[in-house]
Amino acid sequence: MKQQMIGLLSLMTVFCVPAAGQNTQQWRDSLAVLNRQIAAAPDSTDLHLRKAAVNIELGQWEYAADEYTLVLAKNAQNPAARFYRAYTNSQLKRYDQALFDYEELLHQLPTHYEGRLGHAYVQQKLGRRMEAMDELNLMVEMFPDSVTVYAARAGIEQEMGQNELALYDWEQAERLDSLNPDYVLSHAELLYSLRRYEEALAVLNAAVARKIPQGYFHQLYARIRKETKQ
């Protein structure tokens, strides 16, 4: 099932890139400073947003969600607060609440890329695969060069047994990010599961020819050779 997980992880990781340059203690120090500043200026939207961002860095999802709620109570049209409250609620597995915020955000900003990915992600987590697929189909039209969208759609298509569609999307993901071994492996694993061993081997060989280290695919190569007696 690893190749199916790549699609789901593609939806998740676009939101999960930590800020560089500070360790946990430095973030805690920043939080202490922000708490003092907020005590002096409790109506500052900027300070509340900055504090919420630090809460996220520290994994304090509930505190972050509370900060975004304070901001939205003052200005329901603040897109940063709306998006990141949806994100924090998804981290807290409050998917219905996250869905509400993503839909509000997309009503305000229909082309918000991360918002649409988040919308698809929570739909999937709620078991609404068709709705998630509808969102990703729309995103392919809106963002035809997004490798993340193709990979995410391929993962859901596999879960739904739509293997030919998934193969197409893994091919597109490879085309857009030809040096990503995970996409190659997902593509080849699906072909292997369909007993299309020669095609799977061709996908792996082409990736190695593109200078992806063969070691990434060692186990799958061995399984293919076992099936084909090579």
Residue spans for each PLM region:
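A conserved position within tetratricopeptide repeats
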Residues: 34-39, 72, 106, 140, ...
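Terminal, low-structured helical/coil segments at or just beyond the last alpha-helical repeat
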Residues: 25-28, 190-193, 198-230
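N-terminal leader/linker segments that initiate helical-solenoid repeat arrays
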Residues: 18-62, 66
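Structural signature of tandem alpha-helical TPR/SEL1-like repeats
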Residues: 24-33, 59-70, 92-104, 126-138, ...
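Position-specific recognition of the canonical hydrophobic site in helix A of tetratricopeptide repeat
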Residues: 56, 83-90, 124, 151, ...
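Canonical tetratricopeptide repeat
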Residues: 50, 84, 118-121, 152, ...
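Helix-start (N-cap) detector for alpha-helical repeat units in TPR-like alpha-solenoids
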Residues: 45-46, 79-80, 113-114, 147-148, ...
